């Protein structure tokens, strides 16, 4: 029996505010355990939360980017549950009236463009972090009370490819509009996947399983694919009702399987009620208009790159996958580098040399350095082959002066026409017999003349040498 998957995603995006959502503690990552804490995020009796206005602004920006409704009146609620990393024994979140509702994202699939509906996005505080070591556990509350947006999609995705396309687009959007660093390794962009199956053509929604805390696109895809296989096998073996229950599962990255963690709670189990310590959030027209001014979205940037610079779709897609790539590209254009040269030296040459621990952020080659190198190629002052040696040197030394390196390495091309003409005439004079052979039809000898001229000139511009040789040989 053919099955189809029904997939909905809950994405937790940590906002890049300087301070936490309900207190003035820093949100900086990697500090000593429990150093970025205060009575509010420790949940001490009598400590009262105060909403960070920047969180509201960033929520509005996200809502604008996904073409959603911005609810100018929303409320905070307490989500009650007990866990060691939640000191208050409740999480401040939004339930009945979220700040953002009814959005959408368009994704590219094998069958063409597809709309994924977004049910809601709401503000909430993050929990702390449990660290398990041997027979005991530690709790670090530095992350407690950091601001999150939880973005909840409708169950509109039908396979892991669509889920990853949605996540990658959302990941790019939150980075381009500047509301989150979305660093998956640091937990700034985490995903819970709700997965169920049904016979193809059936519109009924069957038992869904939630897979928690996935933080890499590769593992998200693997977890979804495994869960689809597990549920399909259970159905075909007649054990669906016994083996597929509403529960929370974890993905074991080593074994490539999902494992049962606990029964999945319903919303009633959390006993949501309005938080009495926080006023309702009212967004006036001034704040709304101010926050709705967002940076150019990746989709619009892609269209502009293809239209204005005649880029291929694959190249444009790569450039808009990362704000830093787009920044490098546009900076190179501002330096006067041709669009095609910029794409080649950024997306092929520089990215192709970066390894696991070396990234665009820490490679040491700035936009100005790469732009200067690419411009020297456009100007004919250095060959593409020699420029690769300069780029290798820049990476090795974590940066440097491009023009100084070209001179030090003796890679500057000769563009002096008079000097080139003089050498070419000497080459032709010394090889008069081969000139006669060339003129009698042996066209392959042209490469010989180019080689001799380049050898004597030691760094001439090949295109200039070719043009003059063709002229001299008739």
Curated annotation (Swiss-Prot):
HAMAP family (alphabetical): GatB (MF_00121)
Species whose genome carries this gene: Helicobacter pylori (strain ATCC 700392 / 26695) (Campylobacter pylori)
Function: Allows the formation of correctly charged Asn-tRNA(Asn) or Gln-tRNA(Gln) through the transamidation of misacylated Asp-tRNA(Asn) or Glu-tRNA(Gln) in organisms which lack either or both of asparaginyl-tRNA or glutaminyl-tRNA synthetases. The reaction takes place in the presence of glutamine and ATP through an activated phospho-Asp-tRNA(Asn) or phospho-Glu-tRNA(Gln).
Organism phylogeny: Bacteria, Pseudomonadati, Campylobacterota, Epsilonproteobacteria, Campylobacterales
GO molecular function annotation: asparaginyl-tRNA synthase (glutamine-hydrolyzing) activity; ATP binding; glutaminyl-tRNA synthase (glutamine-hydrolyzing) activity
Keywords, sorted A to Z: ATP-binding, Ligase, Nucleotide-binding, Protein biosynthesis
Protein name: Aspartyl/glutamyl-tRNA(Asn/Gln) amidotransferase subunit B
Family that this chain belongs to: Belongs to the GatB/GatE family. GatB subfamily.
Domain of life: Bacteria
Name of one Pfam family that matches: GatB_N
PROSITE patterns tied to this protein: GATB
Enzyme class: ligase
Catalysed reactions, semicolon-separated: L-glutamyl-tRNA(Gln) + L-glutamine + ATP + H2O = L-glutaminyl-tRNA(Gln) + L-glutamate + ADP + phosphate + H(+); L-aspartyl-tRNA(Asn) + L-glutamine + ATP + H2O = L-asparaginyl-tRNA(Asn) + L-glutamate + ADP + phosphate + 2 H(+)
GO BP term, example: glutaminyl-tRNAGln biosynthesis via transamidation
Documented EC number(s): 6.3.5.-
Keyword Protein biosynthesis: yes
InterPro entries per record: Asn/Gln-tRNA_amidoTrfase_suB/E, Asn/Gln-tRNA_Trfase_suB/E_cat, Asn/Gln_amidotransferase, Asn/Gln_tRNA_amidoTrase-B-like, GatB, GatB_C_1, GatB_Yqey_C_2, Gln-tRNA_amidoTrfase_suB_CS
Keyword Protein biosynthesis: yes
Coiled coil: none
């Amino acid at each position: 029996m053919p099955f189809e998957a029904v997939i909905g995603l809950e994405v937790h995006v940590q906002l890049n505010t300087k301070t936490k959502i309900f207190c003035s503690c820093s949100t900086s990552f990697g500090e000593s355990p429990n150093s970025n804490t205060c009575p509010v995020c420790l949940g001490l009796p009598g400590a009262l939360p105060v909403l960070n206005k920047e969180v509201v602004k960033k929520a509005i920006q996200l809502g604008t980017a996904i073409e959603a409704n911005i609810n100018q009146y929303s409320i905070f609620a307490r989500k009650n549950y007990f866990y060691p990393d939640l000191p208050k024994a409740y999480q401040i979140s939004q339930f009945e009236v979220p700040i953002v509702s009814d959005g959408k994202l368009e994704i590219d699939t094998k069958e063409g463009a597809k709309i994924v509906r977004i049910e809601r996005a709401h503000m909430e505080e993050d929990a702390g972090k449990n660290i398990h070591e041997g027979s005991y556990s530690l709790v670090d509350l530095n992350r407690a009370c950091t601001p999150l947006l939880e973005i909840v999609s409708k169950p509109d995705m039908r396979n892991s490819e669509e889920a990853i396309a949605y996540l990658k687009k959302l990941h790019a959007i939150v980075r381009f509009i500047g509301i989150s660093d979305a660093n998956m390794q640091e937990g700034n962009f985490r995903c819970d996947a709700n997965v169920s199956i049904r016979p193809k053509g059936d519109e009924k929604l069957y038992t869904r399983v939630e897979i928690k805390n996935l933080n890499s696109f590769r593992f998200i895809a693997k977890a979804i694919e495994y869960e689809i296989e597990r549920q399909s096998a259970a159905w075909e073996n007649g054990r669906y009702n016994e083996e597929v229950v509403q529960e929370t599962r974890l993905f074991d990255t080593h074994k490539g399987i999902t494992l049962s963690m606990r029964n999945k709670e319903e919303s009633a189990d959390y006993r949501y009620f309005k938080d009495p310590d926080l006023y309702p959030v009212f967004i006036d027209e001034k704040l709304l208009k101010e926050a709705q001014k967002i940076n150019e979205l990746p989709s619009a940037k892609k269209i502009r790159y293809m239209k204005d610079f005649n880029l291929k779709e694959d190249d444009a897609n790569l450039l808009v996958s990362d704000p830093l790539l787009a920044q490098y590209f546009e900076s190179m254009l501002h330096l006067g580098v041709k669009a095609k040269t910029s794409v080649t030296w950024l997306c092929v040459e520089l990215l192709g040399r970066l390894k696991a621990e070396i990234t665009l952020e820490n490679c040491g080659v700035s936009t100005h350095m790469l732009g200067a190198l690419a411009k020297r190629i456009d100007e004919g002052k250095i060959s593409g082959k020699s420029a690769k040696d300069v780029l290798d040197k820049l990476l090795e030394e974590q940066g440097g002066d491009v023009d100084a390196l070209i001179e030090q390495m003796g890679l500057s091309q000769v563009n002096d026409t008079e000097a080139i003409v003089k050498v070419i005439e000497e080459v032709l004079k010394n090889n008069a017999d081969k000139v006669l052979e060339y003129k009698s039809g042996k066209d392959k000898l042209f490469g010989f003349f180019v080689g001799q001229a380049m050898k004597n000139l030691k760094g001439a511009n090949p295109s200039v040498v070719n043009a003059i040789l063709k002229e001299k040989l008739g």
